[in-house]
């Protein structure tokens, strides 16, 4: 196959607890990743060299782009001499904490293995993914909810999907991840709840009393410094949602709804000012 297209879905974080800062400067964390049906589309065509086009002119398509980096890393690892033209239809906002760039990189690794007809062991692909970014392994390997630890690369498939409708709102501001890590309020010395057990209670028993445990350590500093993000949080909290949270380091905020009608109403209200996505209950990546 010399040409095909793939979807690259975004994610939200159900809880994000920063547990330590390593000697190399990276922070360790615990979180639950959940996919949402907000996706980019990537087209791959075999060619002599690696090149890229993007529908969003604000996104660089040079060697700093994660898709280009993924393609060249795979080339170098396997010795493949072929190239590819990558066309990215960018829908997922960047600087939003939704993992769009990481998802695009994971899609590139998987797609180029298929395009170039190469069989790379999953453990080797995982190592390439980790070098590209902490969220890349999730998009490479998982379909539904997953527990993540380490810098995000230690994954456990929970074999679950969220039983709530998800409305995700992009407040039209970008939060630099490096800034968020530099400024969040550190609380390393504290007990960390068992997120895996709690998310199973949420999904199997609909025990919404445990929602309060799923805190995001970036939330307070992001809401403090970005009033529009706080405004979105407050509007969603007043819309009948069962849970509202920042995703990743922001700026996107999501809300979970038991009923589809409430989710649709909230999505319509927020779409007058912001880019939004609504994901149905039970969603899993293809």
From Swiss-Prot:
Domain of life: Bacteria
Coiled coil: none
Functional note: Catalyzes the phosphorylation of the position 2 hydroxy group of 4-diphosphocytidyl-2C-methyl-D-erythritol.
GO biological process: isopentenyl diphosphate biosynthetic process, methylerythritol 4-phosphate pathway; terpenoid biosynthetic process
EC number(s) stated in the UniProt entry for this protein: 2.7.1.148
Keywords noted in UniProt: ATP-binding, Isoprene biosynthesis, Kinase, Nucleotide-binding, Transferase
Descriptive protein name: 4-diphosphocytidyl-2-C-methyl-D-erythritol kinase
Stored InterPro entries: GHMP_kinase_C_dom (IPR013750), GHMP_kinase_C_sf (IPR036554), GHMP_kinase_N_dom (IPR006204), IspE (IPR004424), Ribosomal_Su5_D2-typ_SF (IPR020568), Ribsml_uS5_D2-typ_fold_subgr (IPR014721)
Organism per entry: Chlorobaculum tepidum (strain ATCC 49652 / DSM 12025 / NBRC 103806 / TLS) (Chlorobium tepidum)
Keyword ATP-binding among record annotations: yes
Sequence similarity: Belongs to the GHMP kinase family. IspE subfamily.
SUPFAM superfamilies linked: GHMP Kinase, C-terminal domain, Ribosomal protein S5 domain 2-like
Pathway(s) served: Isoprenoid biosynthesis; isopentenyl diphosphate biosynthesis via DXP pathway; isopentenyl diphosphate from 1-deoxy-D-xylulose 5-phosphate: step 3/6
Gene Ontology MF, one: ATP binding
Residues involved in ATP binding: 93-103
Catalytic activity: 4-CDP-2-C-methyl-D-erythritol + ATP = 4-CDP-2-C-methyl-D-erythritol 2-phosphate + ADP + H(+)
Active site: 11, 135
Keyword match Kinase: yes
Name of encoding gene: ispE
